């Protein structure tokens, strides 16, 4: 993902939430420009720690998604934040998606748009959360 963003985006900063020590160490050792690596202890708050034992590893990652966005908006001087799944790869600039957003809107989220034959909405929900944009205006 990092390399594809670097190739297609003129200006980006990636905030990576490392969910284990090995991931944190490896990412920090790469010294990649435009990347801030955030450890789990830095990020986890009382609410997350309370639900952590009740979730599988995957469920906990999903649970943390909205909190990662809030963490960046609250702790860094940014006017917007885009949540991007770690396995996303860009073949072009994501600006085309952002250009569809009206200035008065604060959130960009898209539905899955499954074909009827492959509809998994009941299991995965209506919205695709691998790319969600938030303005820091509320």
Region spans (language model):
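Glycosyltransferase catalytic domains, chiefly GT-A lineage
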Residues: 1-138
